[in-house]
């Protein structure tokens, strides 16, 4: 595995956008893949984390980001550790993934963590 650097991180993120156009902005018809086969396979690779985590999925036409952020803040204020994933990002891919801390301040997931994850699961994606 190539050691972490800003350049190696950026190459990994760009590779994900190239390999999976639905992660980035593409016409819907090009990004949509019917069926759950790929998602079920990837869940297995990750060890089916959805079976051990309590989650809230916010869906709908408008206001998902606002509702998700309000829920994250409220749950954090109640003393729970909260992770939040939203899409799309504005500048940095890591904006999509946040851990809402006790002080309700969202911190970006480190580039090193994302890079390690992408390297570890690259062959399975």
Give residue ranges: language-model regions.
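Short functional linear segments
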Residues: 1-60, 66-69, 73-78, 85
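Short, basic, glycine/proline-bearing loop/turn elements
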Residues: 56-57, 123-125
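N-terminal phosphate/diphosphate-binding loop that engages ATP/GTP or pyrophosphate donors
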Residues: 69-124
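Short active-site-proximal "capping" loops at secondary-structure junctions
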Residues: 63-64, 90
């Amino acid at each position: 595995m190539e050691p972490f650097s800003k350049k190696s991180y950026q190459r990994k993120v760009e590779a994900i956008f190239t390999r999976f156009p639905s992660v980035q902005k593409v016409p819907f018809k090009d990004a949509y893949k019917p069926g759950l086969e790929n998602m079920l396979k990837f869940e297995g690779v990750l060890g089916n984390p959805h079976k051990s985590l309590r989650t809230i999925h916010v869906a709908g036409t408008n206001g998902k980001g606002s509702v998700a952020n309000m829920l994250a803040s409220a749950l954090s204020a109640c003393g729970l550790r909260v992770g939040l994933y939203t899409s799309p990002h504005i500048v940095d891919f890591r904006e999509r993934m946040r851990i809402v801390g006790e002080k309700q301040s969202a911190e970006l997931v480190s580039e090193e963590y994302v890079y390690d994850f992408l390297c570890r699961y690259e062959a399975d994606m």
